[in-house]
Structure formats: C-alpha cells, structure tokens
C-alpha cells in the first residue's frame, strides 16, 4: 500500500512555480489604480511612453516672443482696417442714437443749446460733443445729429459745428464739418449735391431751410457774402478718393427761411488747432503708446503660456485680450489721421 502511494506521488505532475514578485513601484501603482477604479483594469501607457512637454528654455521663450510679436503686428494692421471699414460704422450708429435721444429730450423741454455756452449758464462753455441740431439732406438720404465742436474725437460721433461760427438757422454763416469715409462717413456724398438741392436743420430755436448755391474746392472763387441779417450754412468734408483726400470740399447753401438772432460765437483764440479742417490730434499718441506697451507684455506672456501651458489654453486667453487692445489702438490711430477722412 505504501509502495502504491509512493508510485502515485512520483507520477503526479509537479506544482506550478510561484508568480514572480512585483516590484514595489508596480505593486503600489496597481493598488492605487484598483482603489481609484474599483478594481478595474489599470490604464496602460502608450507604446512609446507618455510624451513629456519640453522644458521652457530662454531660447524657446525668445522664439515664442518673436513669433507672438509678429502675429500681434499683423493682427493690429488687420484690426485697423476692420475698425475703419466696419467697427467705426457701429461706433457712429450707437453714438448717433445716444445723441438723438439726448437732443430730443432737450428739444421737448426747451433746453436745447442755441449758442456756445450752456443754456441758463452763460459762464460755462457748451461741452464738446453735445448735440445741437438735426441735419437733413434729402438728395443724398442724410439725416444726422450735429454735435458741438470739430475735433477728431467729436467727428467720430457725427458732424460737428465749428464753434467760431453761428448756430444753424441763425443770421450769419454757420460751418459744419463731417467725415467723408470713416465713422459712418456722413458727408461722403456731398459731392453729389447740385445747386438747388435743399437742406433742413432743426435746432432749439427754429427749423431752418437752405438751398445749395455751389460746391467749391481749393482755388475756386468764393461766393458773394450773404447780405446783412441773412443766413448761410457751409458743409465741409474731405475731397477725393476714400481715405486718400486730395483737398477739402465745401458746399455753400443760403437760408430760405427767416434767420433767428445769434447770441454770439466763440472767439478764435478759444479754438483748439485740432478743430480746424483736416487737423490731426497728436494727443492720441499717449494712449497708443500705453496700449502698445501692454501689447508687448501680452506677447511675452503668451509666449510663456504657449510653451508652458499649451496652445489651446493660450488661444482662449489671447483672442479676447488681443482683440480688445487692437481695436483700442485702431480707434486712437484714426485720430492721427485728418479729422475729415
């Protein structure tokens, strides 16, 4: 019996070898994966292993900064074109709506301005950009609010009244300046007017009617001066191709309604040089420099984010930030151009 047992034990297959012991790191990883996934299968690394992001070195950072700077310069040029061609029109439309609402309230209340000073406060000058009249020219489909002052900043919001001239509808000569192309280009079709076309202006004093007598450019003879007590309006804008002015275009129109008295005009010494026809605004350089410095800082920051964080995360932050700065610079840059463009 004992011999039979020994024979069976010898003929039985040997037991399988014990599994190889796992390294401590592998055991810990398996334990963590099992605890996190509830015993699910562990995630295996890709065949080539995980790709590590290269370290941020001064060379890569400098190259990224240069690339971001060139991109920002290109976007700035594109943004300026988009601002002049599209966004400035939206700016003009919004400003006109606000100006019309404000003037309508003043007309209804009888507090619309009729001179260079604030109504009921002769010691205070009317602020630049205040709405003073509504100008209509049916022949070219124009209806716009006229503002006080003729700086480039004022003319972004609509045509401006030259403060050294009388208000429209008053006895004397009233001068209105307006842009040809940018910011709505309200005076872009003045060259289409012909003698006999009508012009109407609504102010706090009157509803004045005018009739065009002539269009003139540099070198053309001046029209005869209006008689004493008569009214005239002169519309002024850039002449020539859009954004390539060759001079100044003036439209003279005599008043056919009864002029109202004028309380006076602002002295020439109070007028800023930036309010003259085709003037530029050098004060726009300061915000341009400040916005430009901020763009340089953003270029450096974006290059670091690109290399240290990731391109898609960087784009999410870069697009709104650069867009805002580019449009802000474009708005200020247009003030360096002649105010009638």
Per-range role (PLM):
Residues 1-61, 265-281, 289-298, 302:
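Terminal targeting segments of Actinobacterial cell-envelope proteins
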Residues 3-6, 49-52, 56-288, 333-341:
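Solvent-exposed, non-transmembrane regions of membrane-associated and secreted proteins
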Residues 62-72, 291, 312-322:
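Alpha-helical transmembrane segments of integral membrane proteins
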Residues 294, 298-341:
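Alpha-helical transmembrane segments forming the membrane-embedded cores
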